[in-house]
Structure formats: C-alpha cells, structure tokens
Amino acid sequence: MSTYTRPVMLLLSGLLLLTLAIAVLNTLVPLWLAQEHMSTWQVGVVSSSYFTGNLVGTLLTGYVIKRIGFNRSYYLSSFIFAAGCAGLGLMIGFWSWLAWRFVAGVGCAMIWVVVESALMCSGTSRNRGRLLAAYMMVYYVGTFLGQLLVSKVSTELMSVLPWVTGLTLAGILPLLFTRVLNQQAENHDSTSITAMLKLRQARLGVNGCIISGIVLGSLYGLMPLYLNHKGVSNASIGFWMAVLVSAGILGQWPIGRLADKFGRLLVLRVQVFVVILGSIAMLSQAAMAPALFILGAAGFTLYPVAMAWACEKVEHHQLVAMNQALLLSYTVGSLLGPSFSAMLMQNFSDNLLFIMIASVSFIYLLMLLRNAGHTPKPVAHV
C-alpha cells in the first residue's frame, strides 16, 4: 500500500492553502494593531488570545472527530477559521480583535488536530513517520510562502482579508473529492492525555514542547513588531520572517537524521545551545541574516525532536494520546510566551524578547544536561 495515498495527498493539498492564510495573518495582525496605535502589551494579549483559542480547539477536536468524522470536522474547522479572518474587518478595536483572534485560534488548532489524527489513522507503524514528516514540510513550506506573499502584495487590512478568507475556504475543496476513514479508532481511546503528561520518563519531551511553544510563539507573535520598531518596512518584515521560516524548513531533514544517528538527547542539547547563540547574536544587530537563520534552523526543529523523544517512552497504542499531550504542551508555551515577552518589551526594552528566549532555553539546557546518563531504549517508533 502506498504511503502517499489519494486521500493523504488531497488532505495535504488543502492544508497547504490553509497554512498560507494562517501565516499571512500571523505576520500582519501585530502590524495592523501597531498601526492602530495599540500598545505593545495589547499586541501581546491579542497574540495570546489566538493561542488560547489553540488550546480550546485542541481540547475540543477529539470529541468533534468522534461525532462527525474527519471530513466534516475538517470542513467545520476551516469555516471557523474563515470566520475568524472575516471578523477582523467588521470592527477594528482591541476587544473585537481579541475575540476574533480567539475564534481563529480555535479553528486553526482544530485543523491541526484533524489533519494529524487523519494521518495517524491513515498510516501504519512503518510509514507514519513519513506521513508526519510530509505534514511538517507542508506546514513550513506554506508558512514560508505566506511570508513571501506579505512581501509582494498590499498589506492593507481590507485588501488582505478578502483573499485570505477565500484561500481558507478554497482549502476545503480538495477534501470534497475524497473521504478520510478512521480505520483504527478503537485503538485511540485507551490512554488519557493527563496520563501522558504525568509520565515521568517522557518529561524532557513534554518540557521541550513547552519551551518550543514559548520560543516560536514569541517569534511568530512579536518578531514582526520588533522589526517594525526598528524601522523595517512591512515588505521587508515579510522577507525576514521568510528567512526565519525557510531556515526551519531546511533544518528539518538534516536534524532529524542527526537525531537518529547520534541520539535525540545530544541533538536537543546542541539545538538549545544554538537557540541561545542566535538570540545573543540578534541583540548585537550586526548580522541579522545569519542570526535569524540559525534561530530558525534550531528553534523550528526543536518541537519534532522533543516530540520524538517523548514518543520513544510510550507503548505503541499510547502514541496518539502522547501526541495530543505534546500539542497541548506546545500550545501552553505558545500562550505564555507572547504575553510575558510583550510585558517585558513594553516596560523595558524590545531586546528583552531575545533575552527571554535565551533564558528559557538555558533553563531547558540545564534540564537536558542533568539527564546526561539517562538514555533509555526506545519503546515505540513512529
């Protein structure tokens, strides 16, 4: 049986369109808020509202899939995200956008969970890793193309919202021509998410996902604002964000190979150390291109390596619950990161964005170094 079946290819095609829309809004919303003369802490709170929606969406989607299946859950989540996009044009204001970004966050998280769960159920133990790798590549390529779009098209609010909403709805079309079946549903309800979060031997992976959420949530939510405060134009901001994301794309395959060859613990240590170096380099402002590149290459690949670490520590039938727990951990980090970073930037200096990223990374590095002699054999492979 082929790994990349027709339903899988159509699912990933729809995801690519949705990711384009998500990436464009994630870059432009902080800039639109700044243009409305909102304070830095308000920008951070709106970003956190989006990630709060992610948290709620992640918790709800399992129930939705069980009730209406993968296809209808995908349609519903796309419609919710489209509503969150269109709603931004109804009324411009802090409280209004706080609500609409929450709605968009719910829809976005539901899309992620539906697609990830569909791929898990479509695959086997032999090809599931390739399916999830394809998913991550599509996600990052879509994000990269979205950043390029920002640098090439008008960034005015009412110019962007119509085609972004249309792109979201177009992402539904591929799934109209296929049906994704849940062939292994009976194996997915045996383990609770709470049990996975409490699993001691997987704690490094869970903590890694939280740290990854803090780092990427802060970069996604506040890097455009940081560059804007430095006098960078909107078009150039899109370019620099594309540099950041492209580094994450290019880093996926080699870092994954290195983790398989030399062990995930060693690779995690090196990744976190490189994130610290990249953050320090950003403070100097002397070489932003290489600094952003190494930040992207190390930061964007931290989540999959930490996820693989945690998944090694569980039985095969627990993999889905563990993946859900890791996504929740990442979302919590994404929620905390922008809020705390925005408060520091508002009250002290924009440079504290990178000091905060370096600090939490250093704490995680200490956790990794404490486990120097603890390298248990893997139980499950995806």
Curated annotation (Swiss-Prot):
InterPro entries in the cross-refs: MFS, MFS_dom, MFS_trans_sf, MFS_YcaD, MFS_YcaD-like
Q: Which residues lie on this side of the membrane: Cytoplasmic?
A: 1-13, 66-78, 123-130, 178-203, 256-269, 312-324, 369-382
PROSITE patterns linked = MFS
Source species, domain of life:
Bacteria
Q: Name one GO cellular component term.
A: plasma membrane
Membrane-spanning ranges: 14-34, 45-65, 79-99, 102-122, 131-151, 157-177, 204-224, 235-255, 270-290, 291-311, 325-345, 348-368
Bilayer topology term:
Multi-pass membrane protein
| Keyword Cell membrane assigned | yes
Periplasmic compartment: which residues?
A: 35-44, 100-101, 152-156, 225-234, 346-347
**Principal location class:** membrane
Q: Where in the cell is it found?
A: Cell inner membrane
Gene3D superfamilies xrefs: MFS general substrate transporter like domains
From the UniProt record, which GO molecular function terms apply? transmembrane transporter activity
- Keyword annotations from UniProtKB, A to Z: Cell inner membrane, Cell membrane, Membrane, Transmembrane, Transmembrane helix, Transport
Looking at the Swiss-Prot or TrEMBL record, what is one Pfam family this protein matches?
Answer: MFS_1
Which NCBIfam families does the record cross-reference, listed alphabetically? PRK03633.1
Write out the similarity annotation: Belongs to the major facilitator superfamily. YcaD (TC 2.A.1.26) family.
Its protein name is Uncharacterized MFS-type transporter YcaD
Give the species: Shigella flexneri
